[in-house]
């Protein structure tokens, strides 16, 4: 599973390098995934809002073919929405780790 698959992302965008650059810029500057925000929502019992917060980051990751972040985000979202079981704290750690890795990788693109 790849952190960022630039070629696959370009395929999805019909090889539009300019659009990919815009999406990367948006991910770096507008898509902020903060672990503390997510943990606060969960602590307040706002699991629906927490799932939506995760979903937004996961969706951005999907557009950019960030397979690891997309996968960990989907796993966490599924647990938050009650679709599957799992350890929420460890899933948060995994998603946050994948997010940080994706940030580093995409900055090289």
Where is each model-derived feature located?
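Amphipathic, coiled-coil-like alpha-helical segments
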Residues: 1-7, 20-23, 27-29, 34, ...
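A local structural micro-motif
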Residues: 49-50, 69
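An anion-binding catalytic pocket shared by soluble metabolic enzymes
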Residues: 57
